């Protein structure tokens, strides 16, 4: 069974990242590798996590012309990752090209999800880049585009999960960042929820970083979260 919890490995060096990984159990959580760590350590680090039997969410948010994104997704799949993402704002052709690039992997193909609206965004920031939709409208619009393109789901704030499920179906995966424990500050993310709130809203997978990575006992925090969920 795939764990509902995805731990974000937001580190700037390999030693700290691996120290945390050694305290975690692949049966209890998946791992997210983002741009910072991937740029620093490259594909070999991802392969090492896969070798340790962790499910890896490669969070590189590909956004380019369709052919380039298709090749990037195929390269990511070669690493053995469980999930990867692209920016939905890249458009229908780009999303379809990404999906097509993974067909050769058959039933073993990674999950392909699309980023809707970053959880750091607020209404004013959407307007500043020329988007007149509200945050829920934009997230839902992009989720429906991803669904039309045949993707498996989206990355979305928990605030938009319920409407996305209504529009795209219960089987359309929602991966939710911006998850904070009740005693944690918002940090640099604006639209946050606790794990329990996000699950009630219908989130399928929760991405949690600092509350786990900065904990004195990460394994204990993960265990407590799983009990609560």
UniProtKB/Swiss-Prot annotation:
GO function terms (MF aspect): orotidine-5'-phosphate decarboxylase activity
UniProt keyword Protein transport present: no
Lineage: Bacteria, Pseudomonadati, Pseudomonadota, Gammaproteobacteria, Legionellales
Residues the record lists as binding substrate: 10, 32, 59-68, 119, 180, 189, 209-210
Class of the enzyme per the UniProt entry, highest EC level: lyase
Species, as recorded: Legionella pneumophila (strain Corby)
Entries under NCBIfam families matching the protein: PRK00230.1, pyrF
CDD domains, A to Z: OMP_decarboxylase_like (cd04725)
Subunit structure: Homodimer.
Keywords: Decarboxylase, Lyase, Pyrimidine biosynthesis
EC numbers, comma separated: 4.1.1.23
Biological processes per GO annotation: 'de novo' pyrimidine nucleobase biosynthetic process; 'de novo' UMP biosynthetic process
Function of the protein: Catalyzes the decarboxylation of orotidine 5'-monophosphate (OMP) to uridine 5'-monophosphate (UMP).
Catalysed reactions listed for this entry: orotidine 5'-phosphate + H(+) = UMP + CO2
UniProt keyword Calcium present: no
Pathway(s) per entry: Pyrimidine metabolism; UMP biosynthesis via de novo pathway; UMP from orotate: step 2/2
Matches recorded under SMART domains: OMPdecase
Annotated InterPro entries: Aldolase_TIM, OMPdecase, OMPdecase_AS, OMPdecase_bac, OMPdeCOase_dom, RibuloseP-bd_barrel
Family statement drawn from the similarity comment of this UniProt entry: Belongs to the OMP decarboxylase family. Type 1 subfamily.
GO terms for cellular component: cytosol
Protein name: Orotidine 5'-phosphate decarboxylase
SUPFAM superfamilies: Ribulose-phoshate binding barrel (SSF51366)
Pfam families: OMPdecase
Active-site residue numbers: 61
């Amino acid at each position: 069974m795939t764990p509902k919890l995805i731990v974000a490995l937001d580190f700037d060096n390999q030693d700290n990242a691996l120290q945390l990984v050694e305290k975690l159990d692949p049966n209890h959580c998946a791992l997210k590798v983002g741009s910072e760590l991937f740029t620093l350590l490259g594909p070999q680090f991802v392969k090492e996590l896969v070798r340790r039997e962790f499910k890896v969410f490669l969070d590189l948010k590909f956004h380019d012309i369709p052919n380039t994104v298709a090749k990037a997704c195929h390269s990511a799949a070669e690493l053995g990752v469980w999930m990867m993402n692209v920016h939905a704002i890249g458009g229908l052709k780009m999303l379809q090209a990404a999906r097509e690039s993974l067909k050769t992997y058959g039933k073993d193909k990674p999950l392909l999800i699309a980023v809707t609206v970053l959880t750091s965004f607020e209404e004013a920031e959407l307007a500043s880049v020329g988007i007149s939709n509200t945050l829920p409208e934009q997230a839902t619009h992009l989720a429906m585009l991803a669904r039309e393109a045949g993707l498996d789901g989206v990355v979305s704030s928990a605030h938009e999960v319920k409407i996305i499920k209504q529009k795209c179906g219960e089987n359309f995966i929602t991966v939710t960042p911006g998850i904070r424990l009740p005693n944690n500050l918002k940090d640099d993310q604006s639209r946050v929820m606790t794990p329990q709130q996000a699950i009630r809203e219908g989130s399928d997978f929760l991405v949690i970083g600092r509350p786990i990575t900065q904990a004195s006992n990460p394994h204990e925090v993960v265990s407590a979260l799983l009990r609560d969920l």
